From Swiss-Prot:
Name of this chain's protein: Fructose-1,6-bisphosphatase class 1
Positions contributing to Mg(2+) 2 binding: 113, 116, 278
Gene3D superfamilies to which the protein is assigned, alphabetical: 3.40.190.80, Fructose-1,6-Bisphosphatase, subunit A, domain 1
Upper taxonomic lineage: Bacteria, Pseudomonadati, Chlorobiota, Chlorobiia, Chlorobiales
Organism for this UniProt entry: Chlorobaculum tepidum (strain ATCC 49652 / DSM 12025 / NBRC 103806 / TLS) (Chlorobium tepidum)
Record-listed Mg(2+) 1 binding positions: 92, 113, 115
Length: 333
């Protein structure tokens, strides 16, 4: 692998290898990469620019909005929408669908979480942007509506995330493997650093907020107890790694192997993570890397969405670990 392969060069190679991926799709991903550079610039200087802390409002989820959330949301809408490739967008921060600039010429749908893990911004923990891309169903950009956004995850044509941490990485898939790029600030480019990412079939870590233990159902509790039991034959006990930033926890488990668990609870019976712009894109990436993603009963990518901000339980990561989680959730163990 050439460490100096830029994201643009990689996309050109991808088109040659897979003719069904047209230049428009790679242009969409380039737009996302450009927007990520803008967000990254503010994330790394947030404490100096006075855009930390709360903005004094709540989003559609009822969550307090951080100033940087609003900044990231605006930057993504304007930077990605300016080229007229998207007819409609949906964001965690907006209750209704968004008609971006120049939407009249758009043929695609973008769903995104502008800054996942934003509650960690003030303490310098990794945060990220998650995105999902679909083709427009209605065919006519001026007629684009909520129905265009409510497509199954299996219909995604591209998905990815950007993690803003000790380094900045963009990880994406178009259904032809998973590839990661690290931002080199000396040249201002994303360079190919992780080609054809695959996740181990068995992991060694589990990521869950065990502070919610009393809210978990019996199946979830039994699964977590299973992971903590000592059994050299199955590589147990697993170690806990939980940051509280979905992008960061998922990224680590993707590379090292493990399972991320955000189950249904007594308080959140439908789960807490959002299906359309959190679970679906990460499930697409995970499956392309050889992993698995379910709600405990169904494949995430097969769920028929009913709402833009629909929530779901999520078990995602190494294939065998998720299969075992499903067995406990379904009462088979």
């Amino acid at each position: 692998m050439n460490k100096l392969t830029t994201i643009e060069s990689h996309f050109l190679q991808l088109q040659k290898r897979y003719p069904e991926i047209n230049s428009e799709v790679t242009d969409l991903l380039n737009d996302v990469a450009f927007a990520a550079k803008l967000v990254r610039r503010e994330v790394v200087r947030a404490g100096l620019a006075d855009i930390l802390g709360l903005a004094g409002s709540t989003n559609v989820q009822g969550e307090e909005v951080k100033k940087l959330d609003l900044f990231a949301n605006e930057r993504l809408i304007n930077a990605i929408g300016q080229h007229g490739r998207f007819a409609i967008m949906g964001s965690e921060e907006n209750e209704e669908i968004i008609k971006p600039p120049k939407f009249e010429s758009g043929e695609y749908v973008l769903l995104f979480d502008p800054l996942d893990g934003s509650s960690n911004i003030d303490v310098n923990v990794s945060v990220g942007t998650i995105f999902s891309i679909y083709r427009l169903k209605s065919g006519e950009p001026s007629q684009a509506s909520l129905e265009d956004c409510l497509q199954k995850g299996a219909d995604q044509i591209a998905a990815g995330y950007v993690i803003y941490g000790s380094s900045v990485m963009m990880v994406y898939t178009t259904g032809h493997g998973v590839h990661g790029f690290t931002y080199d600030q000396t040249v201002g480019e994303f360079l190919l650093s992780h080609e054809n990412i695959t996740t181990p079939e068995h992991g060694k870590y589990y990521s869950v907020n065990e502070g919610s233990w009393q809210e978990f159902n019996d199946g979830t509790k039994r699964f977590l107890d299973y992971l903590k039991e000592e059994d050299k034959a199955t590589g147990r006990p697993y170690s806990t790694r939980y940051i509280g930033s979905f992008v960061a926890d998922f990224h680590r488990n993707l590379l090292t192997g493990g399972v991320f668990v955000y189950p249904a609870t007594k308080k959140h019976k439908n789960g807490k993570l959002r299906l359309m712009y959190e679970a679906n894109p990460m499930a697409f990436i995970c499956e392309q890397a050889g992993g698995r993603a379910t709600d405990g009963y169904r494949r995430i990518l097969d769920i028929e969405p009913k709402e833009l901000h629909q929530r779901t339980p999520l078990y995602i990561g190494s294939k065998n670990d998720v299969l075992i989680a499903e067995e406990f959730e379904q009462g088979k163990r």
